Curated annotation (Swiss-Prot):
The gene is rplY. One of its GO terms (cellular component) is cytosolic large ribosomal subunit. Belongs to the bacterial ribosomal protein bL25 family. CTC subfamily. InterPro entries: Rbsml_bL25/Gln-tRNA_synth_N, Ribosomal_bL25/Gln-tRNA_synth, Ribosomal_bL25_b-dom, Ribosomal_bL25_C, Ribosomal_bL25_long, Ribosomal_L25_dom, Ribosomal_uL5_bac-type. Pfam families: Ribosomal_L25p, Ribosomal_TL5_C. Keywords: Ribonucleoprotein, Ribosomal protein, RNA-binding, rRNA-binding. Part of the 50S ribosomal subunit; part of the 5S rRNA/L5/L18/L25 subcomplex. Contacts the 5S rRNA. Binds to the 5S rRNA independently of L5 and L18. Residues 1-23, 191-211 are annotated as: Disordered. This is Large ribosomal subunit protein bL25. GO terms for molecular function: 5S rRNA binding; structural constituent of ribosome. This is one of the proteins that binds to the 5S RNA in the ribosome where it forms part of the central protuberance. It comes from Dinoroseobacter shibae (strain DSM 16493 / NCIMB 14021 / DFL 12). Residues 196-211 have a biased composition (Acidic residues). GO terms for biological process: translation.
Length: 211
């Protein structure tokens, strides 16, 4: 997410606790709190429709925002949690953490696969299995990547893609200190079944010869 930081407009929220939060929801807002950055927690509220629009747009939890609250200095924040109604799945509360543009933060970044048509394994009918459709990376708050790209060119059935084989965005590092698998190309189910049957026949023949 390099480039201009989008604004997130909020209002100060009077009072804390369940009663104040319920009142905010009745008034058409989603209550929240801003914390971190060496300052006291600040109760806020965001218009329900505006928050819902941003959530539907995607990547809300992976976007650095410029929080604007009337009468206060702008502050950069990232959302760390959105609570939802268990029945309606609508937002009921959110937590925002203060950050500087140079701050480091751990985020799950989606994986994008390209050049499937240039993968011999897929041409043969192999199946691309995304073991990790998202990868947790430590990134700079002011330069959060949209995704990490995995190039499938040249991959055959049985090949795997590990984190060490992927070119990560500048400044991004994995949070897991091992060479974990992101994806692999598996044989088609029909071929796997045929291979299993062949293995069983070979085992039976070997057993018969021993007898």
């Amino acid at each position: 997410m390099a480039g201009e930081i989008p604004d997130l407009v909020a209002e100060p929220r009077a009072g804390t606790g369940k009663g104040a939060a319920r009142q905010a929801r009745r008034d058409g807002y989603v209550p929240g709190v801003v914390y971190g950055g060496g300052a006291d927690p600040q109760p806020i509220q965001i218009k329900f429709n505006e928050l819902l629009r941003r959530l539907k747009a995607g990547r809300f939890m992976a976007t650095l925002f410029n929080l604007k609250v009337e009468g206060q200095e702008d502050v950069r924040v990232i959302c760390r949690n959105v609570q939802r109604d268990v029945v309606k799945d609508l937002p009921t509360h959110l937590d925002l953490m203060r950050l500087r543009r140079t701050s480091k933060v751990n985020l799950f970044i989606p994986v994008e696969f390209i050049n499937e048509g240039a993968a011999p394994g897929i041409k043969k009918g192999g199946v691309l299995t995304a073991v990790r459709p998202e990868v947790e990376l430590r990134v700079t708050a002011g330069d959060i990547p949209e995704s990490i790209t995995v190039d499938l060119t040249g991959l055959d059935i049985g090949d795997t893609v590990t984190i060490s084989s992927v070119t990560l965005p500048e400044g991004a590092t994995p949070t897991i200190d091992r060479d974990f698998v992101i994806a692999n190309i598996q044989a088609p189910s029909g071929l796997r079944s045929a291979d299993n049957e062949a293995d069983e026949e070979e085992t039976e023949e070997a057993t018969a010869e021993e007898v």
